[in-house]
Amino acid sequence: MKKIITLLLVALIAVTACFSFAGCSKEEDESYKFGKELLRYDSQLDTLAKLAASDIDVSIIDSVMAGYYAKTGDYANQIAIVDDLILAQEKYGIAGRKNDKAFVSKINEALIALADSEYETIGSAYGLEESLCLENDTVNPLASADDNSWNEIVSSGKIVIGYTIFAPICYDIVDEVPTKGFDIELAKAVVAYLNAKYNVNLQVEFLLIDWDNKEVDLAQKNIDLIWNGLTITEERAANMCISVPYLNNNQVAVVLKSNLSKYSDAAKILVNMNSAIIGVEKGSAGESVVLK
């Protein structure tokens, strides 16, 4: 019942919204779902900072991140997730270059092999038990891939992973190297598995990227993988080689606790979401939710 209410509410927002985003033509306005203004930032964490400063009314971000910051850190006493409002249901995947199927197949193989061990242990350590979706009987759709991408990675001696700061996925950066995070520890476990299984000596390197430029970094071989809470979409799957899904996620609305009463029922959400200044990360799934 909760899911039905949420989906109906989102549909109502889409149908009845008064579209007035700044700087857009009438034709462009009609492609937006809700809000009176849309502001784009470099990261999801930036949207929370702007929310805490009252520069925006609503932050649309990943539930994985929202759940963490609503309980932990500088914003825990200020922000809250709007109950029962799921704007999109998604899964995370790891993206390689479109033709690097053999390489991504090895990533799949390792993820599946670790499903009942390190994967669960790391997920529990970061409070993500309910978001885990891998099983040890998950089928690797790329198992028969025989291109040269894996051999090229082995020859290079390293796997370069593009990241942004995104707790509990990737955080606590020391000398530009992330030291904590679900994806960080999982990536290290995957590389350790591959080293042992194939008697290779791959090192994992992490490179801070601009999320809005992630596809370019991947195509230009600045990085080998986008492994940072990447939502699987049809468009991304058509342009990149994406792993099996490894984490469930939702797009949710985060507001100040002091304003939470404005979003306490469907009617209030409908009115106040449509009159709100919305903040999103550039190039994110949250932005796509607002732009549909």
PLM features: what roles do these ranges have?
Residues 55, 60-63, 70-74, 111-118, ...:
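Sec/Tat-exported extracytoplasmic proteins
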Residues 27-29, 37-44, 49-53, 62, ...:
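Extracytoplasmic small-molecule ligand-binding "clamshell" domains
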Residues 17-29:
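Sec-dependent signal peptide cleavage junction
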Residues 26, 86-141, 184, 188-193, ...:
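Extended ligand-binding regions for polar small-molecule ligands
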Residues 30-31, 156-165, 180, 267-288:
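Short loop->beta-strand "edge-of-pocket" segments that line small-molecule binding or catalytic clefts
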Residues 45-53, 64-68, 101, 105-113, ...:
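Solvent-exposed, polar/charged alpha-helical surfaces in well-ordered, non-transmembrane soluble domains
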Residues 27, 31, 70-89, 98, ...:
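Acidic, polar ligand-binding/catalytic clefts
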